[in-house]
Amino acid sequence: MKRLRRLLISLMITALMAAGMPMTAFAKPDWPSDTGIESEAGIVMDADSGAVLFGQNIHVQKAPASITKILTALVVIENSSLDDTVTFSHDAVYNVEDGSGNKNAIEEGDTLSVRDCLYLLLMRSSNQAANALAEHVGGSRDGFVKMMNEKTAELGCENSHFANPSGLNDDTQLTSVYDMALIASAAYKNDTLLTISKDKSYRLPATKNNPDGVTIQPEHKLLITTDTESPNYYPYAVAGKTGYTSVAGQTLVTYAIKDDRRQIAVTMKSTQATHYQDTIALLDFGFLRFENVNISENETAYTSGDQPVQIGDNSYQPSDLSMDTSAVITIPKDASFADAEKTVVTDLPEHAPLGAVALL
């Protein structure tokens, strides 16, 4: 019996960035490049294709502050049960940076489920929840940090090093807007994490200082603003995370959906006056100037005809090949699929599907 081979098509058009200046694989037309953001670093990435639609200093390392907690949540969800019980140790509660606060007045000995802690982590940005979850999942904070850095390597992050699960100041806690976009893209593909991040409120159970429980809400203004006249009203925002320290400045991750297109925007080293408006500018830029095109509907050279197809060192019959029907490329709206430069890659990554023979 002839063994069916599958040609994995995961073509994406990406803008290469150098010192914030976009360059493109297109000969025509020019890649759009005008967003006018004021943050020191910013990016908007298509979450389906992985294409960088605009970037400014995208590989420059900066302190992330509490957007770190997106990575923390992802590692926790992948390595624990939501119904596990987490006990807050003395170290989890009190071994934090002076002045960093204690959201919801958690005390040593308080117990919450992993689910409760994740809501406290992502909605209220609790450093105590970050520490307690790290101890629960990693056995220690250091053990969990090792898991965080292993996860970033798995996701292809090349300019990141995490030293704690909360994002509090540490000279070695550094990442880039590009790496954070990779992390966020993976995180919001996780159904549990996305559900928690989308919720507008959550009821925490009783703790020592809140014996009747307490209702918490997100802090990300683009997620909670309902006044259509507000400059922070953005109905396409679905999920995200805020961050701030004296070193990092304002940092922000936002996941938005419009017309079935999904985008990730990240800004770092911003100010209170600019980070939300920069994010809206980035997201609008991506939604208005780009579109996604299905690859399998436009690329037929490998799967049609009766002549053998050469891929790398091997030859295949077109009838033995198929394409990933969900794969898309992101292109400017004034470009076409024919404008894309195509490269066949046969050195496949470890996570490639069984039977895949190439990436296009």
Predicted feature residues:
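Generic "edge-of-domain/loop-turn" microfeature
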Residues: 18, 22-24, 49, 93, ...
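Domain-terminus/edge residues, biased toward the C-terminal soluble/receptor-binding domains
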Residues: 157-158, 172-174, 178-179, 184-360
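Hydrophobic alpha-helical segments, especially transmembrane helices
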Residues: 4-7, 70, 258
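Membrane-helix interfacial "entry" motifs
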Residues: 2-3, 112
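Active-site-adjacent loops and short helices of periplasmic peptidoglycan-processing enzymes
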Residues: 25-178, 182-191, 196
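Sec-dependent N-terminal signal peptides of Gram-positive bacterial secreted proteins and lipoproteins
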Residues: 3-27
